[in-house]
Regions:
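Ribosome-associated RNA-binding proteins
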Residues: 1-184
Length: 184
């Protein structure tokens, strides 16, 4: 019998594969945005599979989006969850409730406009935009989605919009000014 060699943490494998990446230790909340049946037509007939779109986040500025396909819905959701955990990004939240400025996100034919709102306004958003903003941890935002309403593209446009946000500190640093000069 062959003995299995144990690898040290920083030791490279002989087959040049990357070492297994551990799942994040934080537990993230999850929202299933969409599950749908998809069909591939072949000469042997129709092959039916399921596609799932899942959002994960910690409601403190972390958010990730993933998709998965499988023969069963539960397997598709599991794959989508794993994909979402790989695609987690951090986005800024001002005062634990809103965004610093208006922003527009585009994905395909979808445009999403997101605007900050006064305290107590609540989330004025629909569909996938609302899901992304809730899982990210926002409380006071207004939004409008234009063009295509395809859920995955709306979610991707929302995340791209949130990733393009800049804090006052980042703007001040880019302009070579102090934060007080930027805020007026």
């Amino acid at each position: 019998m062959e003995e299995k060699k144990e690898f040290k943490k920083d030791q490279k494998r002989k087959d040049n594969k990357k070492p297994f990446k551990k799942a994040p230790t934080k537990t993230l909340d999850e929202i299933i945005v969409e599950t749908k049946a998809v069909v591939k037509v072949t000469k042997g007939g129709r092959q039916r599979r399921f596609q799932a779109v899942v959002l994960v986040g910690d409601k403190k500025g972390l958010v990730g989006l993933g998709t998965g396909k499988a023969a069963e819905v539960s397997e598709a959701v599991k794959k989508a969850r794993q994909d979402a955990n790989k695609n987690v990004v951090r986005i800024p939240i001002i005062d634990g409730r809103t965004i610093p400025h208006e922003v527009v996100g585009v994905k395909g034919a979808t445009r999403v406009i997101i605007k900050p709102a006064k305290e107590g306004t609540g989330l004025i958003a629909g569909g996938a935009v609302r899901s992304v903003l809730e899982i990210a941890g926002y409380h006071d935002i207004t939004s409008k989605s234009l063009g295509s309403r395809k859920k995955i593209n709306v979610a991707r446009a929302t995340i791209s919009a949130l990733q393009s946000l800049k804090t006052a500190e980042q703007v001040a640093e880019a302009r070579g000014k102090s934060v007080e000069e930027i805020l007026g």
